[in-house]
Amino acid sequence: LSIRRQRQMCIRDRKKAFPPKLYDLTSLQREANRYFGYTAKKTLDMLQELYEEKLVTYPRTDSQFVTEDMRDTVEELVGKMPVLLPFLDYGQLGHNITRVINNAKVSDHHAILPTKEAVEKGISDLTADKKNLMMLVCQQLVQATGEEYQYEQTDIMVKCQGHDFTARGKVPVQMGFKAAGNAFKNQCVKAKPEEETEKETSIPYGYEEGMTLSPVKAEKTVHFTSPPKPFNCLLYTSD
């Protein structure tokens, strides 16, 4: 089916996304389930064991920040993350420790972090599940202290033969913290989380308003939605 362009609009914006926060217990349980299928109890049990082995800080925390007096400690930990996460390209990341510091949002215990002992001992002797959890905690530290992700987003709207067509494309400008997240998922996560499998309609880079569209081939396809998944304990921990 050839489509003849009649009217179009092109909107291009520079956008950015901010790094995620550090983990508290709830957010770590949720992410461990999302990436590895661990139940909340299994995650807590493993965290408790890692804590007793002095590889992570206290796990039963509801804070996602650290205090100002921990600035130097966190700075040192971030600098040593290549020891535990050698697959990351640290040249793309940069870091900003101030992002994770907020005295007002730390009560009894700060966010979950790897420890200096973890760097010294290494994690190669851990079970596969514990190693997954340790790398999840470590990569979150790198992401949370990373730079912003910046990208150029282009939306086009075309009016053709009485029908509206839209498409969106994104071109990364600065990967920032996402460089760590992507490397972690490629290295450590076998199955991609469902919410990340959706693809946006792609458009050619450099598209400008007023350009002539080449004829395109179109076809109709049939898709089916799936019923919601049964509730599990992790759903009740969501914000």
Where are these predicted regions, by residue range?
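Structured, non-catalytic alpha/beta "coupling" segments that mediate domain-domain communication
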Residues: 145-195
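Extended, highly charged linker/hinge segments and catalytic-adjacent loops that couple domains
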Residues: 53-135, 175, 179-218
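Short helix-coil junctions and helix-kink-helix linkers
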Residues: 29-38, 238
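Short amphipathic alpha-helical interaction segments
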Residues: 38-49
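TRNA-recognition modules of translation machinery and tRNA-sensing kinases, especially anticodon-binding
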Residues: 132-139, 153
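Single conserved hydrophobic/aromatic residue that forms the stacking wall/gate
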Residues: 1-7, 11, 239
